Amino acid sequence: MLCTAVRVHAPEFADEAGIYKTAYLNHPCTQWARETRINYRFAVRLFKAMNDEYVWRFPRRSGGVVNTGHASMRHFDALVEAEKYIPDVSNFMTPHPQCFSGWDECKTDEEWPIVAYRAFYALDKMEFARYNKGRTMPTWMNPMPDWQERIYDEDSDS
């Protein structure tokens, strides 16, 4: 998404830097990232933080090789440099999109969708979430959603 933002605003730079080709051009988060420089800057910082978490969770790759980061990090320096090509039209981030179709009950009117994404993950992503290697489950992540409680309650009645 960041590479696409750069390709939209600075295709020559993108080609010279050898960053990924355009992908997800019309995805709401891709549009958001390229809308303003401050949005883009936040997305770059999030990209770095996500890579740091990835390295922390998986310090070794198969064969015992030290994990120095996701392969996409090879584009990080170019993405940082490319910030100057993103329109500097606001001192504030624009409202971040809430991209989880089929879960409208989770969406909020807030400009920053933390509450909405927490609800979405607690309702739909619980089955794959694992908290190990020193990470504890966030307090907002209900370990037993209401639907599971109802199933267990029904089982105990029979």
Stretches found by the model and what they are:
Residues 1-158:
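Sequence termini and other peripheral, non-core segments
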